[in-house]
Amino acid sequence: MAEDGMLLNFSLDDSVIKPQQRFKGGTWKDRLVAKKIAVKRQNKSRHSAETGAVNSNNPQNPNKINVPTGQRPAKRQRIDGGDFKPTTKSSAGGGGVGNDEQTDRKSYGDRQVISSLFTYNPTAKTVASTDGATHDEDTTEPAKPSNAPLVDGIDTFTSLGLSPSLATHLLTKLNLKTPTAIQKSSITQLLKEECDAFVQAQTGSGKTLAYLLPIVERLMRISSHNKGKKDSEGNTVHRDSGLFAIVLAPTRELCKQISVVLDGLLRCAHWIVAGTVIGGEKKKSEKARLRKGLNILVATPGRLADHLENTKVLDVSNVRWLVLDEGDRLMDLGFEEEIQGIIKKLDERRRPSKIPDLPAKRTTILCSATLKMNVQRLGEISLKEAIHIKADPADEDDEQKDGSKQPEFSAPAQLKQSYAVVAAKLRLVTLTALLKRTFARKGSVMKAIIFVSCADSVDFHFEVFTRRESSEELPDADDENAPSSSNVHGSIATASAFSNPSNNVILHKLHGSLPQHVRTATLSAFAKQKDASVLICTDVAARGLDLPNVDFVIEYDPAFCSDDHLHRIGRTARLGRDGRALIFLLPGNEEGYVDILKGSYREGSSNSVTRNEVNEILKRGFGGNSEAISKGWEDKATDWQLDIERWALEDSTILEMARRAYQSHIRAYATHIAAERHMFNIKDLHLGHLAKSFALRDRPAKINVPGLRPGNEDTKKSFKADRKLASGEKRKMSAREDSSSTTDAAEARKKMQQKLKEHMAGASEFNIA
């Protein structure tokens, strides 16, 4: 047949005989995902073949354009290498908030992000007034002081009922000529009647002397009446006569200050002995002082409750005066249970005294600047049929007539308050510029206090402001402006960031995490400092402390409640002196805090709260007075910020300190009271911009601190890696994880060796020191 010699030649494509790819191993979900990816890749290559597109990776690509080397397009600036100054918002094409948000959402891995100080900052909601003055301009008439001593010359300490010897001592030794309004009301009432009292007055009005003078006067009278009696009868007042008065204060610093004031008063009555028992001190030394005998005891509630429970030599049977100073702070710190126990033990151990003229009942005095619910609760616990003592009794009558409720606590009338709306990225440079301008001239400002929210922030800013550049020379040993010898504690140093050749500024730091002897030495050094000095601290220094010559208070972080704000600014403008206070606020909801600032003055007062412009502060701090000098203030501020960031990157200790300060600041920001949380909402914080103010270049998710939980991103990565490890795949560890695991292993090995040494030592098992 003709068909027998026919030969058919079929041309088959390679894809027909290509073996199918099969996926093995892993979970069914992983195999399904891999299969979908392979199918998608095949469909894409088939579509490219049909449309005639050529792969760009092919060296024979006809669509390839060769660009000459001299006309290469401009490359984007690198993010991870070197410092650069980004273009400003006005010069960047198409820049806006939307672009900024997209940039922030980009993943740069472990690379550093260097952002500009003056771009993409939120604008303030409120409009600044055209007649606003800066903090160093005196444009308003000084108000009449509301907490100054009386100047009419009629009321003197002698006319209030004090003995001539005590009044003369106040005049000659303490330089106190006339009493304040609260001292006049309190001394007269407490000497006239033996009843409980609630003393309420402005901060800085002399409440300490208002309750100490009546107690010292009564003890001096009892001593003079029994002067001819023999000591063996126990009727003469001396250190062995017993404990007559107890003063409770919330903080150790306030106890130390009350003790200093009391020692100054008792120089005219040396036979009356006072002492202190506070936390942080050696209990053995305190027991020795109690064993020798004390007549007046200043204590913190926790330590006094401990001594009442465990110290048998502490005899409180003759206690006739109990003072609760800063009652609102005592309740805020949670001392209600201790105070209840102290009052209960005083009632149980009270005995009739053999000393004539000693009151038969105990008088309790509660002192507080505010009349909040917790203070009323403390009054219910400690006071019985108490009288209310105010600086001006007419205020209470006017309030009853008008039916209007005045603020519970008002700022001194002569205090000038101001605020500055500062973007988060500009906080650090603005504070530096403000301090540079404040201490530009010697003698303009003697002392200033900076309040921050947490102890880690205090440590970080102290290191920033006291860092010494390589070009700077160390101060001479005989230099009068050099830091004192207490600098061995690391809490006092020269503020190189805002000092100048004509005005050397000494910086002090104070917070509750420091050892007690360091806190005491630092506070004493700041109080005795005669040159320009700055104290950066937490709220541990916001209550009751009378620090002399404080002219300026800066609230770098707003207080957690309005009452704490009033106590902070009360460190200045004391006893009729002038003072200024400035608070930093973020743009947005925090600007509503200005209404609280305005409401801190008494109704009808002519005082106003002024606004300081950020650009003006930066221009005056990094520029100068003249227009020609102050042109490059933006570049100077940027250079200073970048220098701080490089310094933090080079020193791992400083970098960890900055990260801890950043984390602690965010945690502290979330603790504002509920009534003010709409102004201080943590969800409104721009964490990336806030990290810039702590000299950090890491993204917020990458700012990890040892001992804290990892961020969401790291948690997800570790979860996925563990899941792959469970499925049989080999986990690839990053450099960070490798280093951390190595560190953990080294620490574990070190702890194991330490435990072995302890077990090898025979006496360690019975070491009870």
Curated annotation (Swiss-Prot):
Principal location: nucleus
Region (Disordered): 38-107, 127-150, 391-411, 471-490, 705-769
GO biological process: rRNA processing
Lineage of origin: Eukaryota, Fungi, Dikarya, Ascomycota, Pezizomycotina
SMART domains reported in the protein's UniProt record: DEXDc (SM00487), DUF4217 (SM01178), HELICc (SM00490)
Composition bias type Low complexity, residue spans: 55-68
Name under which the protein is recorded: ATP-dependent RNA helicase DBP7
Species the sequence originates in: Coccidioides immitis (strain RS)
InterPro entries in the cross-refs: DEAD/DEAH_box_helicase_dom, Helicase_ATP-bd, Helicase_C-like, P-loop_NTPase, RNA_helicase_DEAD_Q_motif, SPB4-like_CTE
CDD domains in the cross-refs: DEADc_DDX31, SF2_C_DEAD
UniProt superkingdom: Eukaryota
Record text about domains: The Q motif is unique to and characteristic of the DEAD box family of RNA helicases and controls ATP binding and hydrolysis.
